[in-house]
Every structure is written in C-alpha cells, then in structure tokens.
C-alpha cells in the first residue's frame, strides 16, 4: 500500500487541509470500527507510540495508538495554524512538521516566493524529507493552496519546484483555489498569473477550484435544505458541505462549507488508494491516463451527489442521474461547461454500491453527447471503490481533461491585463529582491501559450473522426 503526504500552505490551504483531515478521520472511523491500524489508514496517517522517547516510535501493525497526519503545515502568519493547534484536531498534527512566521506575505506573490522561499527553503526541505522517510512507499504529494493570496500562491508554488528537484519520482498533485472576479484582494490577478507559470512548469496534475462555483453549489444545496417541499428532506450526514454530520443553517465560518466540498474532492480522489474495490485506480494512473501533454495537466472536477434525500430509496434512475449530473455545468468546481467543450480524457471515480455494469451502461448512454479528441475516442478511465462516503450509498467524482478550463484562464489574463496596463501596485512587487518586470511578461507568455494549446485543440472539434485502419492478416 502506498502513502501520500499533504502539504497545506497559507490560510486557505490550511483551512481546507483541516477539513480534509477531519473528514478523513470520520471516514476511516466509520469503516474501521475495531480500531486496527491497517493499510487504508496508513495511506494518510502514522500510528505513533506516544510513550516512546523523542518523536515517538511508529507502529506498523496492531491497534491504533495515536494517529498522526502525514502532513506539513506552512503559513507565514500564525493565526490559522494556532487555531488548528488549539482545536479538536490538535493531536493529529506533529508539532515538528509546522512552519510559521509572524509578518505574513502581504498578499504579494513576490514576498511569498522570493523572500520566504529563500528564507525557509531548508526548513521546508527538512520537514518534507522527514515526512518522506516515514513512508514505506511514498507515491504522491498533495499541495493545497490559494492562487490569490501571497503565501499560498508564492510559497506554495516555490515548494512545488523544491519537490520536483528533491523528489522527482513522486507525483505532485496541486489543489489550487482560484479567486472569483469579486475577490477582495486587489492584487490577486498578479498573484494568480505569477503562480500559473509555476503550476505550468512544475506540477503533474492541477485541480483548479473556483470560489464562485463553490458558492453557487452551496446556494443550490441551501435551496433544497430550506425548501420544505414534500419528499425533499435531506439526510443530515449526506451534505457535501457538512463535516459535523448535521445540517446547520449557519456554518461557524463563511468558508467552512466551501472548504468541505474541496475536502470531499480529495477524499474521493484518494478512495481507491485507501480502500478495496472491484476496479481500483492508483493515483499515478490519473496522471498517466488523463495528461496526454505535459502542460495540459489541468483537470476539471465535479462531485455528485451533493446530498442524499432522506425518504427515497435509490432506484437505478437516481443512479443514472448521478452520472448525468457529473457532466452538467452546475456540478463543476470551476465555472465551466464540459459538455459543450472538447474532452482529451475523462476519469470516473465511483464509490459505494455500484456495479461495473452500471458504470458501462452510463458511459455508453452519455458518450454520444460528449465530444472527445479524434485520437482518444475511448479516453475513459474508471474506478470502483466499495466504500462510499459517510452518509451516502454511492458517489461519483469526475475528472475531465477538457478545453472548458480555457475560459477560466482567459478571464484571469483579462483581469491581470486591466491591472497591469495601469502599472497599479506594481512597485510592491518590483521592490522585492529578485523581482523584475520580465517576471510578469514571462508569466503572461506562459499562460497565453497554454490558452493557445487549448484553442488549437478546440479548432479540431468539428473535424470528422477518422476511421482507424485495421490490420489485415494474410493467411
């Protein structure tokens, strides 16, 4: 069994990470009721004997003693990390695997990347190495950060290059939260643009998340929960926005519900690596099957169902609806419509009581409405994990390498250009050692080249699919 390490950077990264670890513990507790440390739990947790001197000895088998997350927490302010260390999950994190500063990055990519990157490189590397040494078979680093702030975008993408240099064989999956057009950080277009160049060059897979899409999904769920319509009662533990197993009209913090959606995405993404199933998918297979070209590694994700109705049995029609929803624009985690764009490849990660025949039937049903590139007409990768998320009988995560991601990048470029034309706030960046104006122009060129690659693919959309010649055998 393989292990993964989560590196959560900045306020957003640490808040999502906290939700992820909370949900992961609940999920494993629901499955592993005997309290035995098994391969599934070891994928994200170490079992530590706290009675041992020093770091505590790792226990590979037997009963669970004290679980420690395979995580590195990084933030250049202390607030969020201190909050985590005083909260209910405080014992899950190893205090020696935290890096914090006091001053923060001031919503400036250059400070996070150039200043704190250089200042903390060796400390970060030491903690990454320690996490790697504690794994029997390290397969993947999951990096979680925002694109709009200074620490997440700057230091988050700095450590991506560190990981590439030091652990070239270990996959780098990035969950990057993109700011909405209403973002209150005025410099977020600069930060996002500069971070994009690093993601293009140093990530294996990027799962872009759009704050606006998360907000829209929450609004949609709230409409159902509060509608009071007959037959629309929602199972309390099935809300994709809830981590407390209870429906609450008001979350403790405005971003809690949004963060839980992203945490559920990560749980589903790793489900096959953690639990048994009739059709398992390794994490390396995602990159292998869904990324045909190195730079086109942005995967659009969707999650279904968003909730489960309490008073309805699940007939096949409802199961089929789950598959249909995964391709609708209302369920995408960025503002995108994959059905009207071009697929390079698509993965369906199914959990729970679903048969392979259900999977095949739905792919055949949906295929005519979806356009794939001519050279990858059968570009499907599927996974069936027998363990559903808590509160659901089944769920589906769809990952699409699809040209529908292009408008997100085009909007980012437009927002950047509006700011950059005025040279607004540019001096805050250029006064940082190592920053030059060419850093901005190179970042724009990098993103424009990426957009052009998607445009070139889109241009092939209306072309007929060539018949593949078959070999004739001479007898």
UniProtKB/Swiss-Prot annotation:
Protein name from the UniProt record: Tubulin epsilon chain
Q: Identify the keywords attached in UniProt to this record, alphabetized.
A: Cytoplasm, Cytoskeleton, GTP-binding, Microtubule, Nucleotide-binding
The cross-references to CDD domains, in alphabetical order and at most eight, read: epsilon_tubulin (cd02190)
InterPro entries recorded: Epsilon_tubulin (IPR004057), Tub_FtsZ_C (IPR008280), Tubulin (IPR000217), Tubulin/FtsZ_2-layer-sand-dom (IPR018316), Tubulin/FtsZ_GTPase_sf (IPR036525), Tubulin_C (IPR023123), Tubulin_CS (IPR017975), Tubulin_FtsZ_GTPase (IPR003008)
Q: Which domain of life is it from?
A: Eukaryota
The record's section on Gene3D superfamilies has: Helix hairpin bin, Tubulin/FtsZ, GTPase domain
User: Which SUPFAM superfamilies does the record cross-reference, listed alphabetically?
Assistant: Tubulin C-terminal domain-like (SSF55307), Tubulin nucleotide-binding domain-like (SSF52490)
Q: How does it assemble?
A: Found in a complex with TEDC1, TEDC2, TUBE1 and TUBD1.
Residues involved in GTP binding? 148-154
> Which organism was this protein described from?
Mus musculus
Cross-referenced Pfam families: Tubulin (PF00091), Tubulin_C (PF03953)
GO BP annotation list: microtubule-based process
Similarity annotation: Belongs to the tubulin family.
For molecular function, the Gene Ontology terms on record are: GTP binding
Q: Where in the cell is it found?
A: Cytoplasm, Cytoskeleton, Microtubule organizing center, Centrosome
The entry's cellular-component GO terms read: centrosome; cytoplasm; microtubule
């Amino acid at each position: 069994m393989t292990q993964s390490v989560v590196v959560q950077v900045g306020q957003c990264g640490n808040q999502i990470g906290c939700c992820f670890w909370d949900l992961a513990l609940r999920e494993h507790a629901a499955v592993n009721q005997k309290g035995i440390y098994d391969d599934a739990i070891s994928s994200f947790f170490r079992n530590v004997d706290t009675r041992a001197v020093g770091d505590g000895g790792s226990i590979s088998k037997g009963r669970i003693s004290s679980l420690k997350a395979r995580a590195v927490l990084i933030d250049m302010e202390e607030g969020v990390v201190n909050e985590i260390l005083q909260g209910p999950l405080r014992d899950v994190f190893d205090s020696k695997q935290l890096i914090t500063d006091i001053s923060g990055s001031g919503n400036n990519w250059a400070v996070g990347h150039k200043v704190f990157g250089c200042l903390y490189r060796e400390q970060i590397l030491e903690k990454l190495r320690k996490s790697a040494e504690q794994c029997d078979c390290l397969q993947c680093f999951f990096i979680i950060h925002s694109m709009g702030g200074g620490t997440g975008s700057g230091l988050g993408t700095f450590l991506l290059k560190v990981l590439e240099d030091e652990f070239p064989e270990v996959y780098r999956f990035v969950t990057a939260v993109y700011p909405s057009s209403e973002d209150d950080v005025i410099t977020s277009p600069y930060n996002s643009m500069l971070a994009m160049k690093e993601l293009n060059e140093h990530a294996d897979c990027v799962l872009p998340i759009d704050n606006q899409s998360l907000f829209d999904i929450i609004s949609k769920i709230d409409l159902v929960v509060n509608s009071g319509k007959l037959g629309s009662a929602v199972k309390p533990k099935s809300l994709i926005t809830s981590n407390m197993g209870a429906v609450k009209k008001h979350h403790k913090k405005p971003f809690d519900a949004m963060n839980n959606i992203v945490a559920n995405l990560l749980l589903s993404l790793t489900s096959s690596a953690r639990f048994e199933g009739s059709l398992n998918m390794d994490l390396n297979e995602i990159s292998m099957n869904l990324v045909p070209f190195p730079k086109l590694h942005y995967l659009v994700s969707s999650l279904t169902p968003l909730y489960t109705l309490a008073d309805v049995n699940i007939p096949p029609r409802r199961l089929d609806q789950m598959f249909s929803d995964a391709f609708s624009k209302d369920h995408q985690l960025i503002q995108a419509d994959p059905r009207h764009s071009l697929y390079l490849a698509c993965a369906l990660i199914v959990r729970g009581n679903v048969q392979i025949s259900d999977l095949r039937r739905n792919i055949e049903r949906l295929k005519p409405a979806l356009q794939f590139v001519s050279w990858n007409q059968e570009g499907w990768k599927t996974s069936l994990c027998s363990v559903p998320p808590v509160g659901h009988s089944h769920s589906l995560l769809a990952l699409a390498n699809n040209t529908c991601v292009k408008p997100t990048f085009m909007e980012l470029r437009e927002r950047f250009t509006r700011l950059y034309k005025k040279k607004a706030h540019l001096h805050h960046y250029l006064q940082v050692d190592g920053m030059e104006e060419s850093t901005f122009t190179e970042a724009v060129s990098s993103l424009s080249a990426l957009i052009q690659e998607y445009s070139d693919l889109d241009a092939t959309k209306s072309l007929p699919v060539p018949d593949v010649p078959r070999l004739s055998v001479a007898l």
